[in-house]
Each structure stands twice: as structure tokens, then as C-alpha cells.
């Protein structure tokens, strides 16, 4: 298997899909990353944990419809060209 631009894009799509399907109550809450976790005090920089939680929520919110479209295109391309 050659390392091509298509395989790189497919790997990125799989990673974004993995982030998008993380369920907050089933998975994130079990590892201590639920919504009830404190973000920090006033004037403090948010930590890595809160920034990752914000990234996960943003990906799940913003990328829902584009992921459906890109996944559909990827499936059609795989069916047509193997």
C-alpha cells in the first residue's frame, strides 16, 4: 500500500469521525471529562483538558453535516474505484 494524498486524507477523516462519535455521557464522563468539570477561575488560562473538551464539542457541533457529506463522497469513491 502506497502512502498517497488520498490515504492521508482518509486517515484524517477517520480521526475526525472518531472525535465526532465520542458520546459525552457514555464515554467522556467515565474518564472524568464530562460537562460538570470546572473550567477554572476568572483570569486564569484554560488548561489542556478544557481546551480538548472545547475542541471535541466544537467538532461535534460544527462538523456534523460536512462529515455526512464527506463520508458519503468517500464511500462512493471507494465503491467506484476500489
From Swiss-Prot:
Bilayer disposition of the protein: Multi-pass membrane protein
Described purpose of this protein according to its UniProt entry: Regulator of endoplasmic reticulum secretion that acts as a key determinant of brain size. Required for secretion of extracellular matrix proteins. Required for correct brain development by depositing sufficient extracellular matrix proteins for tissue integrity and the proliferation of neural progenitors. Acts as a regulator of the unfolded protein response (UPR).
Protein species of origin: Rattus norvegicus (Rat)
GO cellular component, one term: endoplasmic reticulum membrane
Places the protein is found: Endoplasmic reticulum membrane
InterPro entries the record matches: Yos1
This protein's name: Immediate early response 3-interacting protein 1
Any Gene Ontology biological process: organ growth
Amino acid at each position: 500500500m502506497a502512502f498517497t494524498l488520498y490515504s492521508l486524507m482518509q486517515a484524517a477523516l477517520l480521526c475526525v469521525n472518531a472525535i465526532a462519535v465520542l458520546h459525552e455521557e457514555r464515554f467522556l464522563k467515565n474518564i472524568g471529562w464530562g460537562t460538570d468539570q470546572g473550567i477554572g477561575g476568572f483570569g486564569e488560562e484554560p488548561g489542556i483538558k478544557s481546551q480538548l473538551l472545547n475542541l471535541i464539542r466544537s467538532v461535534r457541533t460544527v462538523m456534523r453535516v460536512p462529515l455526512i457529506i464527506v463520508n458519503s463522497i468517500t464511500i462512493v469513491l471507494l465503491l467506484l474505484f476500489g
